[in-house]
Amino acid sequence: EHFTQEEVFSLNERIIVAPVLHQHKKKINIFLPYCDEGWFDYFSFKFISTGGWVTLEVPINKIPIIVRGGTLIPKLKVVFHKPHLAPIEEIILFPSKINIAITQKNMPLIFDDGDTNDYQKNKNLILTPKIKIEKNKLFLIFNKIGNGKAQKEKIILKYPNNTKLILKNCSNYFIK
């Protein structure tokens, strides 16, 4: 049913966007695909559902964005004249309703100067995150490739207040 909705779209298997297309609408009904990890509000980290039909309040100043539990989203500060050099400012980690271990192989964090072929000399940095969630503990483990540096000294990690975050490998890059 999720794929038959005309006013809802998936950015990928982990993020759903439900724009409000009708004036004066205060609530929308959408179908979320079932997942054990659960679906969460992007802005508040509030748990929504593990799937099925849900009704969401839609304030005028917010587009509903729903994120699957256990998702890691890097946020960039875009430099318009050189977008490939946009430094990662923040990483958002979403909780999960179940104990899980996820390796987001499709989401490595790549740090490169963007101008040279130094990556061929291993002068870039690739961090592939693995997220492990147990009760209210979120383990963030990075597989590190290369000897390059991140564009910023520190990257902010954003996650729910009631969750304890444990970093393994590369913790010197992050501010909790």
PLM-predicted stretches and their roles:
Residues 149, 164-176:
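A carboxyl-terminal module marker
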Residues 1-160:
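Catalytic core of carbohydrate-active enzymes
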